[in-house]
């Protein structure tokens, strides 16, 4: 019987005293494999339940976004200016899933932006259509790679640097919220992601 990742993790703990550096590296890879497995499972569940929409609740979008920004402020480089443009209005959608998407977009922005700006804004585009926009002044994503970032398994990479499944998962969550997640191909000063929702 082959050992599970949890059993391997416990075994690795024994290296802490004799080889602390190796212990950290091995543990990081085990943790990355666990997350990769969880993400694959979630992708499968999302793909098989796209017709099942999430329950919606009414909430104040300004207060909601303040709480989201509070959760990511520790991840943002001190040289980065953070701004928001959120009106004090009520919307109706699934707050938990919206938070997941925004947190992922903002944390990605924090990783790649070490100076300049990160901005979160909200725009009403009609009676029941709105946009959440996350903009950063990081290096941006080459145009030829922009379509691929929402598709799983488009590149092989070191899992300790992330498995590349976060955006595909967010895109599927957006679909289940009767919305879409896209990148603005016209924006050239970094990256701009646009989440469109029916609210």
Placement of each model-derived feature along the sequence:
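Conserved micro-motifs of the catalytic ATP-binding
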Residues: 48-54, 90-93
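Short helix-loop "hinge" at the ATP-lid/N-box region of the Bergerat-fold HATPase_c
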Residues: 109-110
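Short beta-strand/loop element within the Bergerat-fold HATPase_c
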Residues: 117-128
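Acidic ATP/Mg2+-coordinating residue in the GHKL
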Residues: 136
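Short conserved segment of the HATPase_c
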Residues: 141-153
């Amino acid at each position: 019987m082959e050992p599970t990742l949890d059993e391997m993790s416990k075994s690795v703990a024994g290296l802490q005293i004799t080889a602390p550096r190796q212990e950290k590296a091995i543990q990081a890879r085990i943790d990355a494999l666990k997350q990769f497995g969880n993400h694959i499972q979630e992708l499968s569940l999302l793909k098989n339940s796209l017709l099942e929409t999430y329950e919606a609740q009414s909430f104040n979008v300004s207060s909601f976004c303040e709480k989201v920004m509070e959760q990511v402020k520790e991840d943002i480089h001190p040289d980065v200016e953070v701004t928001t443009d959120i009106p004090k209005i009520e919307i109706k959608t699934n707050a938990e899933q919206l938070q997941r998407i925004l947190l992922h977009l903002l944390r990605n922005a924090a990783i790649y932006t070490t100076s300049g700006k990160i901005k979160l804004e909200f725009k009403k585009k009609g009676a029941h259509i709105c946009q959440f926009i996350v903009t950063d002044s990081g290096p941006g994503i080459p145009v030829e790679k922009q379509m691929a970032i929402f598709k799983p398994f488009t590149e092989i990479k070191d899992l300790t640097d992330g498995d590349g499944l976060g955006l595909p998962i967010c895109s599927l969550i957006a679909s289940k919220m009767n919305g879409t997640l896209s990148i603005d191909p016209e924006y050239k000063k970094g990256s701009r992601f646009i989440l469109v929702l029916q609210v």
